[in-house]
Every structure is written in C-alpha cells, then in structure tokens.
Amino acid sequence: MEEIEIIHKPVMLKEVIHYLKLSPGKIVVDATLGLGGHSSEILRELKGEGLLIGIDRDEEVLNLARERLRKIANNFVLFNTTYDKVQEILKELKLSFIDAILFDLGFSSFHIEKSERGFSFMRPEEPLDMRYSKDTTLTAADILNSFNELELSNLFWEYGEEPLSRKLAKKIVERRKEKKFVYVKDLLEVVEEVIPKRKRHEATKVFQALRIVVNDEVNILKRALDQIPFILAPRGRIVVLTYHSIEDRVVKNFFKSHSDKIFPVNKKVIRPSVNEIRENRRARSAKLRVGERRE
C-alpha cells in the first residue's frame, strides 16, 4: 500500500472535500474511484455513518482501492462498472437520492506507472492497449491498424484537437502497410516524424484522443451527467474535476442545459493553487466545477 500512496496524489483534495459539503450520515458517490485518494478523505468525513458508493471500471484498481478504504471504515460499497450506470446502482441499493457525487475525470497515475497498457508515451515498450477495462474489446492498436485515414484524422482533431491531424493520419495509414502498430514506440516513431517539438510533448494530444475513443469517455460522461438531476437530493452537490477542454466543454454544457434544476455554486471555475501544481504536476490542467440541486 505504501507504493500506492507514492504514485497517487488526489488532485485538489481540500477543495473537493469542501465543495462536496460532507457530514456524517450522507450518501456520497465517488464516480471515479481510482485508487481511492478522494474516497479515503470522504470516508473520514462521514465518520462511520452514511454510505460511500465507489465506482470504477478497472477491476485491478478497484481491488487496490478496497484494501485502502478498509483501513479507514466499512461504510462503503464498490461497483466494478462504468459510472453511467449510477442510476442502476442506486436502484440495486434501493436508494432514490444521493447527497453528493464526485467525478474526477483524470486517469489514475496507476495507469501510467503500473498498468502496462500503453497509456503513456514515456513507456515505449508497452503495448498500444489503453483500455481501462478488459471487458472493452477495442484497443489503441486496433484503431491505428483499422480506421481509415478520414476516421483517424477526425479522431485526432475532435478528441485531441491536434492541428496536424490530417498529416498524422496519412502517415499512419502509409506506415501500417509496411508494419502494424503494436507498441507505443511504433506510434511515437510516426508522431516524431510528423509533429515538431512543442512545449508539451508532441504525442500528448494523440494519446489523449486514442484513450478517449478506446474507453468511450465522452459518451459515458454525457450519459452519466444526464442522470444527475434525477438522483441528486435537493441542495445536493455535484463536483467535477476536468483536465482538458473536450471534457470541460461537456460539463459546461451540462450545467447550462440543466440550469433550471442545478445552479453553479461558483461563477468562475476553480483552479489548483500554485503550491499544489508545484507538488503534483497532474494538477496543472485541472478545473473544478461545482453545482447544487435546486430545492
């Protein structure tokens, strides 16, 4: 467990706990449990009363989180599924409403450091998998080896906002005629050939786009958010951490389209402190949005 502590620092923990407005007896959902960084603190705030419901699609990560949470309290239940199943979960638990829900849309540092599934361009020897769950069939390699040039170009533009998406797609199609994409290094060779050096690594947007599509992240997020007005108790809170403009746009649109039922607690988006960014690089692009269910 010490190893887990080292590789996982929950982003904006103090702010998240503050805006969830926790107290003993409340029913809280952590829709993106991960290694349980935020949930550990949520359990402490509940003080053995109420219920924490944790959701994660990665069984390996879920089991690690379970061991961590057991050391704090036992008033929690975990589900190995996608968070767009939240209404089904509440039905199974015979619950009508929840008091708070957290979405931390960043992928766990476990996936970069320990999963060996090719989430990071810093791991050239890993396979191009990028699946959070083995129940998903489509891998990053499948996309690179089978999508046509237009599909690849659209993917990199829509989900990565990569300005050289067309050029990159063309080069990928050319390259796979000679050699299939299997490992991270195979993709990096093409990226480095097409995309010039940038402030952030030139593969960042490409890997983001592939990860989003492999795991159907945008559609799952939209489906989950649409359920919130029906499951959040009056004055209940929704707290969302986003890390890139695509998912942040989805969250902004949700608050806008459901303003009759949920109002934004803060007029402006909340950003991590300079100190936190210095201590935890994963926090640098984080944006925190908070909504409250109208009575």
UniProtKB/Swiss-Prot annotation:
Q: What is its EC number?
A: 2.1.1.199
GO process annotations (BP) = rRNA base methylation
Q: Which GO terms describe its cellular component?
A: cytoplasm
Q: Which residues bind S-adenosyl-L-methionine?
A: 36-38, 56, 90, 104, 111
Q: Where in the cell is it found?
A: Cytoplasm
- What does it catalyze? cytidine(1402) in 16S rRNA + S-adenosyl-L-methionine = N(4)-methylcytidine(1402) in 16S rRNA + S-adenosyl-L-homocysteine + H(+)
Q: Annotated Gene Ontology MF terms?
A: rRNA (cytosine-N4-)-methyltransferase activity
Please verify whether the record's keywords include Methyltransferase: yes
> How would you classify this enzyme at the top EC level?
transferase
Query: What are the record keywords, sorted?
Result: Cytoplasm, Methyltransferase, rRNA processing, S-adenosyl-L-methionine, Transferase
The protein's job, in short, is: Specifically methylates the N4 position of cytidine in position 1402 (C1402) of 16S rRNA.
Annotated family? Belongs to the methyltransferase superfamily. RsmH family.
Enumerate the PANTHER family for this protein.
Answer: 12S RRNA N4-METHYLCYTIDINE METHYLTRANSFERASE, S-ADENOSYL-METHYLTRANSFERASE MRAW
Protein name stated in the entry: Ribosomal RNA small subunit methyltransferase H
Q: Gene for this protein? A: rsmH
